[in-house]
Amino acid sequence: VNGDRYELVVTDRQTLLDVIRDEVGLKGTKRGCTTGACGVCTINDASGAAILSCLTHALEWDGEAITTIEGLEKDGRLDAIQQAFVEYGAVQCGFCTPGVI
């Protein structure tokens, strides 16, 4: 997760969202509709493809690299999309922003 390795005990009932938020402690990935429709739970795989973490079993990702909103900034600098959201005031209330980015 975001370049860090975690050794966790995960059940076959936990989603990737559950593990990211509840086990790893990263709260940027949000829990919304839990049906994949809203996109607030979106994270990226190693290729940059969007993954709906609320619909994905955590065990399927054992040993795989994923990136959450917290992993986008590098050396204290926001990534280009994050910076554009700030510059153009695209955040509104901000709840869904991590999934959109």
Question: Where are the language model's segments positioned?
Answer:
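Signature of N-terminal electron-transfer/Fe-S-associated modules in redox systems
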Residues: 1-101
